[in-house]
């Protein structure tokens, strides 16, 4: 059957990927362009250029033009019938900004299908580079953003996050100070996601409602740019000029932005009624890679740990991030990012293997898992024993804001007493379960208040906990995740490889163009998503008694963090 097809693009730091799906959400084509391996003429490493003297990390925008032609050529070689493509959306690395020059709209409109995008659009930008999320050149600007509304908590309350180096607002502030003449000649500023949509539209696309929340400029509660923060950011050119540069932000994440530009119709054979849907950020796109229901939790267990949740509750805090949901009005995306994830667990795993010895061909996690499963929750052999808890940070952490280090405590929930200790711990064995507990207790602590009771008198908790990334293969980690976070429906391993962002973007296009009036993304995708193709239940979720015991531990865990922060002279 020659049904409609939809393309989701993922413009990440190291590659551009396109995933083509049909109405049943089945992937039919994939094309990738690896920036380091496939590009010509750019002095990049891992997709970026680094200026260590100023802590700058940025990408040449022309590289992305070369990549888009490359990915579309790849789909053409595979035999994709472009005329069947009904809709296009995308995901872009969050926070990055693209600076368009005064000729941008004209150059986008006048593309010649006989020439490449790179040849024709390299002159469309007032500045040839886009700051990357790894850039940390904006400490001064972040301090100003945090102070401007009266503190980091006030900024988080307004925009969903405190100031971060990578966020677009602080980056624009630094840009207009460093390059005042270039800033004056900048006609528009796009995010990476809206830049991608602009290329397909043949004119500059509006910002996406979810991705706009990664700027420290969008007031989430007001649903508008924050006038005070624009004032801080705009400099001598003024607020109205910056508003014009940024443009309007439509509320509907599935809005029809317009039809595909003539260039793609003539060069690749796209149909003239192929519709462009707003592209969103890579993190919001990730929660669209499955029908994530409100209160479902998604935990990415890679080198670092990322926790994503869809929630109707807006409860901002300087340690977390809130964004408008990319498709569903009235919902928010909650996000936590930790630097210490898999690396910290591996340190303890290696210490255990050094002590116990391990045959070379054996699973390196076997000892760690066995000890974790044999150790009682919180290391309590009996209820009267103190709970063992600790913080294990081989690298500096951002949640909470602490130097690299290890801290171990005994906590007595009966009287609330907490003591730092090195005695009574059998190291490294006791640390196996303790580190997994520490990581999941931090998630539970910071997502408190975002979940509701699933009914039948059960305490508030997620419906499902989805684990992705390397750590999701580990049965002991999955079991402890369920014991601490709960999950009335259980703990699931989600198998979408590294395709989450592109899949989410493709699903967004399907939803936007095939939804019935008022039909939510979760409803439409939920009806078509074949969960047996993507997920496997790997552990129980809520267990009566155990979940409550960890609830008592949570009070001690929060006390422990505050005590260590106080000792280290830091404040949250």
Swiss-Prot record:
- Give its localization: Cytoplasm
Gene Ontology annotations for the cellular component aspect, listed alphabetically:
cytosol
Q: Name one Pfam family in it.
A: FGGY_C
Q: Where does substrate bind?
A: 95, 166, 282-283
What's the EC number here? 2.7.1.17
Which keywords does this chain's UniProt record carry? ATP-binding, Carbohydrate metabolism, Cytoplasm, Kinase, Nucleotide-binding, Transferase, Xylose metabolism
Q: Does the keyword Cytoplasm apply?
A: yes
Main localisation, per the record? Answer: cytoplasm
The record's Gene Ontology biological-process terms are: D-xylose metabolic process; xylulose metabolic process
The family line of this record is: Belongs to the FGGY kinase family.
This molecule's function is given as:
Highly specific D-xylulose kinase which participates in the catabolism of xylose. Xylose is a major component of hemicelluloses such as xylan. Most fungi utilize D-xylose via three enzymatic reactions, xylose reductase (XR), xylitol dehydrogenase (XDH), and xylulokinase, to form xylulose 5-phosphate, which enters pentose phosphate pathway.
Name it.
Probable D-xylulose kinase A
Which species expresses this protein natively?
A: Aspergillus flavus (strain ATCC 200026 / FGSC A1120 / IAM 13836 / NRRL 3357 / JCM 12722 / SRRC 167)
């Amino acid at each position: 059957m020659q049904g409609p097809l939809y393309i989701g693009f993922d413009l990440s730091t190291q590659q551009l990927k396109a995933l083509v799906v049909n109405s049943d959400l089945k992937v039919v084509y994939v094309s990738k362009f690896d920036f380091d391996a496939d590009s010509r003429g750019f002095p990049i490493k891992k997709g970026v250029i680094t200026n260590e003297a100023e802590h700058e990390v940025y990408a040449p925008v022309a590289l992305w033009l070369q990549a888009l032609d490359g990915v579309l050529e790849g789909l053409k070689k595979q035999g994709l019938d472009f005329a069947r493509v009904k809709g296009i959306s995308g995901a872009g690395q969050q926070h990055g900004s693209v600076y368009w020059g005064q000729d941008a709209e004209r150059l986008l409109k006048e593309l010649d299908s006989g020439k490449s995008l790179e040849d024709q659009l390299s002159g469309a930008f007032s500045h040839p580079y886009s700051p990357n999320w790894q850039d940390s050149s904006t400490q001064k600007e972040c301090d100003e953003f945090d102070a401007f509304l009266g503190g980091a908590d006030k900024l988080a309350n307004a925009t969903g996050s405190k100031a971060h180096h990578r966020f677009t607002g602080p980056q624009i502030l630094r840009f207009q100070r460093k390059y005042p003449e270039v800033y004056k000649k900048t006609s528009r500023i796009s995010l990476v996601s809206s830049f991608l949509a602009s290329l397909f539209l043949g004119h500059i696309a509006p910002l996406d409602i979810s991705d706009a929340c990664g700027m420290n400029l969008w007031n989430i509660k007001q649903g508008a740019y924050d006038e005070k923060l624009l004032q801080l950011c705009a400099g001598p050119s003024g607020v109205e000029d910056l508003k014009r540069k940024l443009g309007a932000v439509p509320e509907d994440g599935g809005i029809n932005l317009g039809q595909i530009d003539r260039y793609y119709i003539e060069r690749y054979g796209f149909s003239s009624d192929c519709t462009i849907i707003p592209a969103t950020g890579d993190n919001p796109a990730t929660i669209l890679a499955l029908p994530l229901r409100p209160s479902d939790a998604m935990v990415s267990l890679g080198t670092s740990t990322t926790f994503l949740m869809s929630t109707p509750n807006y409860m901002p805090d300087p340690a977390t991030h809130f964004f408008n949901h990319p498709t569903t009005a009235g919902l928010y995306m909650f996000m936590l990012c930790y630097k210490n994830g898999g690396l910290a667990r591996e340190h303890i795993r290696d210490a255990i293997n050094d002590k116990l010895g391990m045959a070379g061909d054996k699973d390196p996690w076997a000892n760690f898992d066995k000890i974790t499963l044999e150790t009682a929750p919180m290391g309590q052999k009996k209820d009267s024993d103190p709970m063992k808890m600790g913080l294990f940070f081989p690298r500096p952490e951002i949640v909470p804001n602490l130097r690299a280090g290890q801290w171990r405590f005994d906590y007595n929930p009966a009287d609330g007493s907490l003591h730092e200790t090195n005695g009574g711990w059998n190291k490294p064995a006791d640390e196996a379960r303790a580190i997994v507990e520490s990581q999941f207790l931090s998630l539970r602590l910071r997502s408190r208040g975002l979940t509701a009771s699933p009914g039948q008198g059960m305490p508030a908790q997620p419906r499902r906990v989805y684990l992705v990334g390397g750590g999701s293969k580990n049965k002991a980690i999955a079991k402890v995740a369920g014991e601490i976070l709960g999950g009335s429906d259980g703990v699931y391993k989600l198998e979408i490889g590294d395709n989450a962002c592109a899949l989410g973007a493709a699903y967004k296009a399907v939803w936007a163009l095939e939804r019935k009036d008022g039909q939510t993304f979760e409803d439409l995708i939920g009806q078509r998503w074949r969960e047996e193709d993507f997920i496997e239940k790997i552990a129980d979720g809520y267990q009566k008694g155990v979940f409550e015991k960890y609830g008592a531990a949570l009070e001690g865990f929060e006390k422990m963090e505050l005590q260590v922060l106080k000792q280290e002279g830091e404040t949250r």
